[in-house]
């Protein structure tokens, strides 16, 4: 690439770059220099790692950061996923802030009390905050004492189920947590009622003991804690992205229950997808889980069913209704223990539809025994807009205003008033049968063999639901542990749990295509089987860039994965406009050259086609590949102010800083006072020897002043005693200014002891533009010697021409009007010395000639020169 000046005079005013080796002394740099090699091709961006990089927080500003840009488009450059290596509790090559850390406080190798910590770039996120339904008191909490919760910046709740959200009031009101909490609108709407019901049913909301003790008898949190936590919770819409202190997260549909969502999280270039509990199968009222448009680096996925396979939903509904119909036919009762929200609404939709299709069942009562569900049914009626198309269409129809306005379902307000006479179906909470209405009905109906209990959800280890699957002959009373009840009631498991099975989970992992998978929310055995199955599936990728690694950490076990994120900078403001103009010119030249090449190829192809037609041959050649037209390397150097905040890097000109960052700026000016024993003419000679030209802007009896390279000011106070009292001033706005000032100061300090000074001061000299010297062995004047070679335009053109001659030899032919041609074979390059332009159909030759001319401009120019050169 060749710099395009506006005029011939301007062309030769371009000073050559300053190299550090040319300065006699360099000061320590207080600024960070970063060099980014950025390259954009038509397919993707390949970016090399910076030679030096550092994460800057709180909008620290680094001046004079240099970016070597090979291609820049649309004002910014993107990159692909960061490269990574991983260890498990081992030291690795990455700094601590470059390590992604996963720490499970609960829900690892178990189902229940889901709570996970992820940490990267000093940002901490907690994913879910549940309680274990099979445990009580503090034992049901995640292991909060194993991690400093005050470090958590954001807490994301995936859905309202107890094992994912029940410890949230405790975290928000009774711990040192100070972060922000987010969940979807529907989840928050249900959260309040669910938590209050949970406190009541599990009896953990009793009044505190007088001494404030924390034993099993004291409450873990109160209704007041729930209400206060409720007010602090913030909401997020599906498909909306929020950014908090450099953490970006987006919510996507997860299926499972109303309001359930996945979170796609981005921190400093690292992408993490947390599925929560999710279902890839659309049911009667919810969407299936979505596949996010971006691919994550790390997937944190549930593994509830491990390698198990679930039956098709149609078959599950057929089995459910068949068992219910058969039990009613023989005069029995059917108990369906469910979670109050989610699975319950799905079953009620199935039963209401089945009853409407079977007249012989319409005299049999179907009851829903849950005060909580009745309260929350209004939420379901409100949020039909986020349900699937079937529900939304049903809601909008005139025949039935709301699909949750059931015709054949009745609610039980008080179990003591329930008239248990004849066959019936009761959908009751809780789903694990630990307490409440479902447990009372189980104990009441258990001795009768005509009755049936159908377990429709996932059964957690240690609960009565899990115990029933073992078909015990006796069950323990919930109110009196010493009393046992004979169990003759039939037991069926027909899982409507809205979780993924192995096939669905495996297909989802394949679609999102992560390089790392962390399995959570699953018992040890099924989770271990799932890990083995996934590793076996991706065994062929081992050792390649597409390798997939799978982890199943235990609770309180830290997983460390090293990610070296790449620094990406956006060029903004006037700096971007300048670069875009340069790039447009380069792209135009590139396209023009490529079009010429395509034209030549087309002409050759047409000639070849004519020959083939004459010979009766068919054309089997392929068309030129146009994908390479846009490949571009510029080598353009861009300088500006680098602003870093929340992992975003912006490169700006100083004057644009306030507009784009709202940062205020200050100018720092440095002064250095020194004294030397020499006259001004000798000082000027030494400075010109180094810099070629100094601009004297004031020369009177009181003061002398000059400017060097428009950066460093040198003042001399002539009113002070013998010697020169010098003040050197410069603005600390970049590394070059500091280095240039150091060089000037070093030259001034060396004048007194320089051998050249001694020699020059011992002879008669005229320290003007030329210097008069004598031979060492004679007092006669020999000839004037210039500080530098001639810098006029004609002389520099001659030296550039000599450089081209040395490069291309006899292939170079000089033409009148300061032009030349270079002919190599059939390829000709036209050179215009005045405009510093090269015209050539061959990109290779054109680039070579332009590089020689560019180097010649640099070599023939001093560091600084008189703007009035002839």
From Swiss-Prot:
Biased composition (Polar residues): 618-627
Keywords assigned by UniProt, alphabetized: Endonuclease, Hydrolase, Metal-binding, mRNA processing, Nuclease, Nucleus, Zinc
Gene3D superfamilies hit by this protein: 3.40.50.10890, Ribonuclease Z/Hydroxyacylglutathione hydrolase-like (3.60.15.10)
Localization, UniProt: Nucleus
GO molecular function: 5'-3' RNA exonuclease activity; metal ion binding; RNA binding; RNA endonuclease activity
Known EC number: 3.1.27.-
Biased composition (Acidic residues): 601-612
Record: residues binding Zn(2+) 1: 159, 161, 256, 277
Function: Component of the cleavage factor I (CF I) involved in pre-mRNA 3'-end processing.
Family, per entry: Belongs to the metallo-beta-lactamase superfamily. RNA-metabolizing metallo-beta-lactamase-like family. CPSF2/YSH1 subfamily.
Protein name: Endoribonuclease YSH1
Originating species: Candida albicans (strain SC5314 / ATCC MYA-2876)
